[in-house]
Amino acid sequence: MGKVIGIDLGTTNSCVAVMEGGEAVVIPNAEGARTTPSVVGFSKTGERLVGQVAKRQAVSNPDRTIQSIKRYMGTNHKVSIDGKDYSPQEISAMILSKLKADAEAYLGESVTQAVITVPAYFSDAQRQATKDAGKIAGLEVLRIINEPTAAALAYGLDKEGDQTIQVFDLGGGTFDVSILELGDGVFEVKSTSGNNRLGGDDFDQRIVDFLVAEFKKETGVDLSKDKMAMQRLKESAEKAKIELSGVLSTNVNLPFISVGADGPLHLDVNISRAKFDELTADLVEKTMGPTRQALADSGLETNEINKVLMVGGSTRIPAVQEAVRKFLGKEPHKGINPDECVALGAAIQAGVLAGEVKDVLLLDVTPLSLGIETLGGVFTKLIDRNTTIPTSKSQIFSTAADNQPSVEIHVLQGERQMAADNKTLGRFQLSGIPPAPRGVPQIEVKFDIDVNGIVSVSAKDMGTGTVQSISITGGTGGLSDDEINRMVNEAEKFAEEDKKRKEAVEVKNQADSLIYQAEKTIKDLGENADKAKVEAVQKAVEELRTAMNGNDTDLIKNKLEELTKPLHELTADLYQQQQAQQAAAQGGCAGGNCGGQAEKDNVVDADYEVKDDNK
């Protein structure tokens, strides 16, 4: 079994780690950074850019740059570039492919398996979408684990004794809070809650809105209509947010942000931490609802929580830390890196699956209740939230009308009382029910949740033994096997195109180098050069230059070879000329004509006498 990597596929940044020598280590990317921006860009020439290079060109190319795609996982959202629609799974797969390539470069071997983390509050559709993204990227996803649980693994692997911890995970686009009990290598999740639409992006947006309002008040110009200006504002807002975690005030200065009647307009606004706290107070308060819910579901009191782990870059915001401190009455634990601990935890779980890590048992839970729609549009729960997974549960139902020949099983996920208010996971029919009065047929509905939190449901007519089942494959926004296979093939095709593009660049670089060498050789030979050989080289150089103007890599390779032979002959002439010059120089010295030797021969010894003036 090859190396299994752990991936934190984040909203704004992603990270990859692996077990080495019994320890989880973060794998740096090709640019040398330990995290990779979850950004995908398409250049004007159609080249795909991922990570820091994509983020750098976002200001000048906002319409063709995709950020925070994780927020759309498990939905029908599509991104249209050059007339082609991309699903969130495909965009996420591009990010995963970059992380996979970086891991392969670091490890020096092929990587085909991974553990990928998701927010604890991700629905079944979002989990399935994440698994599909991995498949498109050429990865077998051995396990999907929850981000707070992964962070707890990273924190608690080397800890002794029993303790209860709360993981407060506020990332770029999602928020989770989980309570776990740790002891003797067992990591048991007691409860989890969260909000999949709350994260650092929302804090950034508050600053952007404030800057737009201030600029409009001062100049009358509405920057929200200018995509390029908005991208600059978004980048500056993120920097300001980060700076305000360490200082009490920061300045946002963006020259030439727009143009007015009298010429260029510049944005220059000071933002204090107090102002930032005021702008985002309701967002901080939104984190407290799930925090209270998780504590209530765990059946614990605040004084029974031993430690609070702060996970995700947004937990560096002072107001967030203060809210947690106030609620739990204790200082948040800052002994782990909030940007890397989730990937490290994923790598540890990967190590468990690969047999590298022993005596670790992870007991996670399902974040939302699961059930079916019953008579009157009621949501009947079969599996309650915070049930340890994997799990299986069945219940007997019956028909709602006399002689009903079939029933539709409407599978739902959520906490509301009515079916219409919950998330539909799928529907399927159980047919062939023999005629009978209502309430007589017995239909067993069985739910199974695997270790990844992915659901499958079956219905069985107890009278006839007829069984119908559905494996939930993403519900809304889910991909069929055919769609996934098509996307896998496209991803492989792109990888091949990328390889060809890289080869074309390398061949052109070789050609440039050889042309430079040819011209330098001709110059060094000067008047002593064999004219026929020079003409042959010059002709080959011109043909190579012409080939380089096109995109036919094979033609350039051929012309490279055609230049190499006459150039070798010319280089041999240059070498012989240099050898002759060196021999002539040495011969001159041997004849006594070297300057140093002549001077030595002309030295005359002089007699001298010392006079003593005191005599």
Curated annotation (Swiss-Prot):
Q: Where is this region: Disordered?
A: 581-615
Residues with the modification Phosphothreonine, per the entry, are: 174
Q: How far does the signal peptide extend, from start to end residue?
A: none
- What are the inducing conditions? By stress conditions e.g. heat shock.
What Gene3D superfamilies does the database record attribute to this sequence?
1.20.1270.10, 3.30.30.30, 3.30.420.40, Actin, Chain A, domain 4, Substrate Binding Domain Of DNAk, Chain A, domain 1
Describe its function: Acts as a chaperone.
Q: Its family? A: Belongs to the heat shock protein 70 family.
Q: What is the protein name stated in its UniProt record?
A: Chaperone protein DnaK
Its lineage opens with: Bacteria, Bacillati, Bacillota, Clostridia, Eubacteriales
